[in-house]
Amino acid sequence: MAKFEAHLKCSFCGKSQEQVRKLIAGPGVYICDECIDLCNEILDEELLENPSKVKDGNDSKIPTSASTVSKPAPTLSSIPKPIEIKSFLDNQVVGQEDAKKILSVAVYNHYKRLAWQGSETNEIDLHTTKLHKSNILLIGPTGSGKTLLAQTLAELLDVPFAVADATTLTEAGYVGEDVENILLRLLQKSDMDVELAQRGIIYIDEIDKIARKSENPSITRDVSGEGVQQALLKMLEGTIANVPPQGGRKHPYQDSIQIDTSQILFICGGAFVGLEDIVQKRLGRNSIGFMTNDNRGKSRKSNDLPKNQVLNNLEPDDLVRYGLIPEFIGRMPVSAVLEPLDVDALEAILQEPRDAVIKQFITLMSMDNVKLTFEENAIKSIAKEAFRRKTGARALRGIVEELMLELMYKLPSQDEIKNCSVTQAMVEAITGGKIVPLPPSDKRATKESA
C-alpha cells in the first residue's frame, strides 16, 4: 500500500505527491494545491471581465436568482385592473365572457397579493392579515381556449409561463415524470432565474386525466391518478420544492434548486368528459317518497337545461364523484366553465383575434406578393366543418391548411398572379375529400377559384 501511495500524482499537472504541498483525492482523480490556485486565478479573471456571472454562495454550479438581473416585483400601480385584463383577453379569445371575468379578477387578486408583500404597501398596516393564493381550475371541451387564456394572461403580465401535461406525471419512484419537473420547465422559461420563476404562471393541462378510477379511495396503488393528485397538493398550496436542474430521474446525484411555490399561480385545465352527466344526475335526482309539486317542477326544470348550461350548476361534490380528491379540489378555489364553441364563435375566431388563422395566411401569401381574400360564405363553410369535427378551434387551422395546400404549392412560382380568392366551392370540395387543382397560369392579374 505504501508503494502505491508513493506513486500518487496530480491528474492535471502530473506532479507527484512529494512535489506539492497538498494532493486532494476524488473518485479516480487527484488535484494538487497549485492547480487549485491556478483554477481560482482563471475564475477571478473571468469574473472581472464579466461581473454578471457572479453567483451567490460558494457553489457556482447551482443557478440562483442573483445569476441574472431579475425583473422588479409587481407594484400595485403596475398591475392591470380586471377590466383591462379582460379587454386584453377579448383581443385574443372569442366568447367565454364568464370565464374571462373570473380569470381577470383571480389573476388581478393574485398579483395584487404579491405587490402587497412588497415595499409599496408598507405604508398600510395590513400585514397582520396573511393573504393566501387562489389557484384556478378551467373546465371546458377541447379547443375551447383553456390554454390560450392562460398564455394570454402570461403575455399581458410579462411573467414566465410554462405548460405541463398531467398525463405524463407519476408518483416518485415510478416510470414517468416527477411533479417537480413542472417547476423545472418554469425555471427554464425564466432563464434559471429563481426569483423571476417564483412569480410565474404554470398551466397543467389534461388535469382530468389524473382523476382516480372510482369515487371511493383506491385500495391498490394508482400511480398516475390519485397518487399524482397527492404529490401535487403541497406544490399547489405553497412549499419549498427541491428542483433538480437537469431532471430528477436521469441525474439522481445532482444538486437541487429550491423554489418557493407559494407565489406561483397554478391554472389547471381539463375537458372533464362525462361531468355533465354527473351534474345532471344530481340535479334531476328524485326525492324519496311522494314528490311535491315543487320537487316535480325542479326535476323537470333541471332536465330541460341545455347541455352547455348544465356545468353552470357545478358543485365540488360533482368533481369528487368524477375522481378528484377533496384535498385537491380545496386547493383550486376558483373554477371557470368554458362553453363549447358554436358555429358563430368559430366564424369569429377565424377573423377577429389578433393572430386569427385567416390573418396568418393572408400575411404568408403577402410575402409572395399575392393578395389573399376569403369570401364570406367560404368562412361560414370552414366554421361549419370545424363544428362538425368536434375539436373546437383547433380544427380551424387544419381545415385552412388543407384548403391552402394547392395554392401555397403553386402560387409562389406564378409571379403574374397578384390576387387570389378562396370560395365556398373550394371549401366544400376539400371537406368532401376532393382536392381542387390550381388552374395553370393564363397571365391574368387576378385568379378566382371555384
Swiss-Prot record:
Domain ClpX-type ZB per the UniProt entry, residue ranges: 1-51
Domain of life, per lineage: Bacteria
Sequence positions that bind Zn(2+): 10, 13, 32, 35
Keyword entries, A-Z: ATP-binding, Chaperone, Metal-binding, Nucleotide-binding, Zinc
CDD domains reported in the protein's UniProt record: RecA-like_ClpX
Single GO MF annotation: zinc ion binding
One GO cellular component, as annotated: HslUV protease complex
Entries under PROSITE patterns matching the protein: CLPX_ZB (PS51902)
SUPFAM superfamilies membership: Glucocorticoid receptor-like (DNA-binding domain), P-loop containing nucleoside triphosphate hydrolases
InterPro entries linked: AAA+_ATPase, ATP-dep_Clp_protease_ClpX, ATPase_AAA_core, Clp_ATPase_C, Clp_protease_ATP-bd_su_ClpX, ClpX_bact, P-loop_NTPase, Znf_CppX_C4
Pfam families in the cross-refs: AAA_2 (PF07724), ClpB_D2-small (PF10431), zf-C4_ClpX (PF06689)
Region described as Disordered: 53-75
Binding site for ATP: 141-148
Residue stretches of biased makeup (Polar residues): 61-75
Keyword set includes Zinc: yes
BP GO terms, sorted: cell division; proteolysis involved in protein catabolic process
HAMAP family: ClpX (MF_00175)
Task performed by this protein: ATP-dependent specificity component of the Clp protease. It directs the protease to specific substrates. Can perform chaperone functions in the absence of ClpP.
Subunit-level organization: Component of the ClpX-ClpP complex. Forms a hexameric ring that, in the presence of ATP, binds to fourteen ClpP subunits assembled into a disk-like structure with a central cavity, resembling the structure of eukaryotic proteasomes.
Homology family: Belongs to the ClpX chaperone family.
Full protein name: ATP-dependent Clp protease ATP-binding subunit ClpX
Organism from which the protein derives: Prochlorococcus marinus (strain SARG / CCMP1375 / SS120)
Lineage of source species: Bacteria, Bacillati, Cyanobacteriota, Cyanophyceae, Synechococcales
Gene label: clpX
